[in-house]
Amino acid sequence: MRFFLSGYVGRRIGETFPWGTFVVNVSGAFVIGTAAGLGARLGGIFSTTIFHEFIMVGLLGGYTTVSSFCLQSVNLMLDGEQRQALFNIVASALLCVLAVAAGYGGIMWIMEWPG
């Protein structure tokens, strides 16, 4: 899944910057935040060790890719693209944290709706 989405985004937006990895990591962070919110709000299966280890660490951790992000940042620096490398590092870290918070907060907000 990561390979196909990353490749698709790269072909659509361009490959002079690692947009594919960027999109994969931010979307994965959002889904991990959503899963954590489900565990905190609903409990049950969503708060079990197996859910945490298999879904969050295994599947979603395997979907996102810190190693590719790091290598691409170093390659940008080696290619003389220090600004793009810095943007990649700062924007990835910031947006991934915000995406986790948005996923988590979104679940908390939705689950408080009267219904």
Swiss-Prot record:
Gene name tied to this protein: fluC4
Natural source organism: Brucella melitensis biotype 1 (strain ATCC 23456 / CCUG 17765 / NCTC 10094 / 16M)
Binding site for Na(+): G61, T64
Keyword Transmembrane helix recorded: yes
Pfam families: CRCB
Subcellular location: Cell inner membrane
A single GO cellular-component term on record: plasma membrane
Topology of this chain in the membrane: Multi-pass membrane protein
Protein name: Fluoride-specific ion channel FluC 4
GO biological process, one term: cellular detoxification of fluoride
Catalytic activity field: fluoride(in) = fluoride(out)
Main location: membrane
Ranges annotated as spanning the membrane: 19-39, 42-62, 89-109
